[in-house]
């Protein structure tokens, strides 16, 4: 699997007309996802049996897809063998997977992914940017904070916001501003 690296790979996962940030766990040559029950992603994996990993480096898209639906024009139809899938426009690469539910818990589905096709659309070098990485972490914490209102998660979000302000560029700062609107934190440090 050329596009995935060992560990957790943060992507925007698309299912049928749905997009959400997702971590693909890649260990010992096996790709898996943990998908929370009740999510659109879980429902569509159960119904259709596929998922597309979209590789892009736009922090605003990660924040937006965590909290809202994208318009239909943001999706591109692709035919992968006998399966019609949707990916996002403007991605640098994408990979379509068969998604098989291996295990179910009260909270999540454990899904094994089998690569069907991967495509590199453009090659771009992305130096490590702590601001971008912190947007990913803050967004993960924010989705959990919305459910639990855990003060510890609020503290983590504030910590990452500080790093974004220090290390991020204009697009990371825009993503942080958008994230703040979803959480109603205002401009607090």
Predicted regions and their residues:
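C-terminal non-catalytic accessory extensions
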Residues: 173-189
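Short, structured beta-strand-loop surface elements
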Residues: 38-86
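Eukaryotic intrinsically disordered, low-complexity regulatory regions
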Residues: 137-177
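N-terminal structural module
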Residues: 1-54, 60
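Short, conserved beta-strand edge motifs with alternating hydrophobic and charged residues
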Residues: 52-57, 95-96, 112
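Short coil-to-beta-strand transition motifs
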Residues: 87-95
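A residue-level detector for short acidic-glycine micro-motifs
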Residues: 24-26, 55, 99-103, 117
